[in-house]
Every structure is written in C-alpha cells, then in structure tokens.
C-alpha cells in the first residue's frame, strides 16, 4: 500500500497464495480505490490491501467495495486458527502477474467523466495521501475555472469517502453528497446500490426521482450486479465522487448549494468551542474522542466533523443525523467532551 514494510508483507502473502495454487495479479503500491476498480473492471474474485504502519494487516474486499460473505470470512478465520493451509505441487503452483498498469487505467476512468474545462467550478482536493494528491492535481488543476465557485473536497484517510466545503453550503458530509449524486444517477435511469446502513435520505431521493435503490450487506446479496457497475464507484471511491459531482455542477452550470437543495435534509447542528487548536491539542482531542485523521466521528446514523478555524483560535463542530434532535444532542455531547478535556 505504501511503505517498504507493507511491500515485503505483500510479497510474502503472494508466495503463500501461489503455493495454494491461486494466481495473483499484483497492482503494486496503490490504495483501496485502485484495488476496488481492478476487482470490478477485470472480474477478480477478491482484492487484498496490505498495510504495515504499526503492525502488518490485510484488508479483504470483493467487487463493488463490498465485504465478502460472512460464511467465507468465518471459513478463512477457521483455517487461520487451525493453520490448515492448502498446499499444491510445484506443477500446480500459481503465478504472480504484474498488474500495475491498472493504476493508470483507473485514472483514465476518472478522466472520462470530466469535461476538458470546468464551467463555474474551481475545485481543490485536500488529502494526506501524496499519491492521491498527485492524481487529484492531474484531474483538476488544468480544468479549473479560476473565477468559478470555490469548492474544497476533503478525502478520507483511505480515500473511500469525501466531504465538501463551500462558502454558501459550509461543510457537506459524504452521506449528503452520495445522496445528491444518487439522485443524478436516478435521473439518468441508472440503479444505485448502497450499504444497508446508509442513511435513509437516499431512500427519499429514490422516491423523489422514481429511482431504483438497492441495499447490500455483502457480496452474497442481489445488489452485487448494480454495485459492481462503473457508475456506482461514487459510493466507495471519494475521488470518483468528487469528480462526478464536479462534472455535474459544470455541466448544469449550477452551484453546489443549488445541487443540494433538492436532496432530502439530513439534519445538521453546529457548535463553536473557544479552544486554541495547537498540534498538541488537536492530537489530544482526536485521540480522546476517537476521531479519524480528518476529525470525523460516527455513532450509528449520526455523524460529526471537527474543524479548526483558520487562525487556530477555535473549533467548529458540525453534526448530521436523521433527526434534528439527534444531531443537536450529538453535537452538544462532543462539545462538552472537548471542554472536559481541558478542565
């Protein structure tokens, strides 16, 4: 995925898989977005993302960004516990094929949905991933309308989600962006597949547009055929979603606020906390609250994001939920916990 340690772990895993008589297609240093695309586009059974930041770990995914069937996961766990690994003879050993070119094919897929030049849109992508930042610069820098609406997209640490910010909309959570673009797909007559725990505003969008919305839990569900469709990548690929939303705004000549006005409300609440957001304080707050690297917190169907002011002299807490009461309560709880940290 990134480090030399993860590369060594990947090579060791490849040897074990080949010894079991299974072929491996290696895409090299890449993220879950490229891996998911490769599994979808070229009909792979599964994708494995290897990481080794603190300790070695592997993430198993199947087509459409879905989790593998629970029965399969249980079987894998049982084999690992019993150390009952399959091994074949030399003549049946699998082979490793260099499939790194898929990373360039993935970028080309994103370029296909973007116009040569944006009209009325000026996009900036924020991410901690240097590789993602390089791809984003290639996709957006030369296409931006410098006089257009300024929109900042914040990619999640693993690149699967994205939130947005503009002066007129303030922060827009991933869930609302997904619901908005799902509506665009419904207008085009395309079906959409979402995780079963996705907020209900997507169902309301489907009703408004007479769209076909499927829910899935894992790759055993009937929604798999829809989930693996290229247009459904916006559900599990933050960069694809940012590209698709930007393309739609440019094509329609509308602002992000206008595009979101027809999306069913996901109720929001916000609070200000007057605490200096130094690097030490930020680390302490995120650690105590269990935030992601982007300052996001999720509890059931309620989501929140913590953002420092530009001058670092305060924090704004934004929360979104299926009801106004839940959003306000969650926002108030986070605010109280932050204040409690510095008592």
Could you say what each language-model-derived stretch is?
Residues 19-22, 116-122, 185-191, 209:
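Short, surface-exposed connector motifs at secondary-structure boundaries
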Residues 1-58, 137-171:
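N-terminal small/polar loop signature for handling phosphorylated ligands or for N-terminal nucleophile
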Residues 12, 34-37, 75, 105-113, ...:
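Alpha-helical scaffold segments in soluble metabolic enzymes
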Residues 55-151, 166:
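Gly/Ser/Thr-enriched, mixed-charge loops and adjacent short helices
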Residues 26, 62-82, 171-187, 217:
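Short, acidic/small-residue loops that bind anionic groups at enzyme active sites
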Residues 1-4, 120-130, 190-196:
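Short hydrophobic beta-strand segments
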Residues 6, 10, 14, 133-136, ...:
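Short, highly selective alpha-helical patches that border small-molecule cofactor pockets
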Residues 156-160, 165-170, 174-343:
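Phosphate-binding and adjacent anionic-ligand microenvironments
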């Amino acid at each position: 995925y990134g480090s030399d340690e993860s590369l060594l772990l990947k090579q060791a895993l490849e040897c074990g898989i080949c010894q079991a008589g299974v072929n491996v297609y290696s895409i090299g240093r890449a993220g879950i977005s490229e891996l998911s695309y490769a599994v979808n586009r070229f009909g792979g059974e599964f994708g494995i993302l290897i990481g080794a930041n603190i300790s070695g770990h592997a993430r198993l995914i199947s087509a459409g960004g879905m989790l593998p069937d629970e029965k399969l996961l249980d079987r894998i766990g049982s084999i690992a516990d019993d150390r009952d690994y399959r091994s074949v003879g030399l003549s049946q050993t699998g082979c490793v094929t260099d499939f790194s070119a898929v990373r360039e094919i993935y970028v080309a897929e994103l370029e296909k949905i973007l116009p040569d030049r944006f009209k009325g849109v000026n996009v900036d992508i924020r991410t901690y991933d240097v590789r993602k930042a390089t791809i984003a610069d290639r996709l957006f820098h030369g296409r931006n309308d410098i006089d257009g609406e300024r929109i900042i997209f914040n990619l999640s640490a693993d690149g699967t989600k994205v939130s947005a910010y503009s002066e007129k909309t303030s922060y827009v959570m991933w869930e609302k962006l997904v619901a908005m673009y799902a509506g665009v797909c419904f207008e085009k007559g395309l079906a959409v597949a979402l995780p079963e725990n996705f907020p209900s505003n997507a169902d309301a969008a489907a009703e408004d547009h007479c769209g076909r919305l499927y829910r899935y839990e894992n790759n055993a569900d009937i929604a798999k055929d829809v989930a693996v469709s290229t247009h459904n990548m916006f559900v599990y690929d933050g960069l694809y979603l940012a590209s698709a939303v930007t393309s739609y705004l440019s094509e329609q000549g509308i602002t992000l606020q206008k595009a979101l006005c027809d999306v069913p409300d996901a109720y929001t609440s916000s609070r200000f906390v007057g605490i200096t957001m130094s690097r030490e304080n930020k680390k302490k707050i995120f650690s105590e609250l269990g935030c992601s690297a982007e300052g996001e917190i999720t509890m059931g169907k309620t989501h929140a994001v913590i953002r420092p002011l530009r001058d670092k002299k305060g924090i704004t807490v934004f929360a979104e939920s299926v009801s106004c009461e839940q959003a306000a309560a969650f926002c108030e709880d986070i605010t109280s916990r932050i204040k409690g940290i510095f008592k």
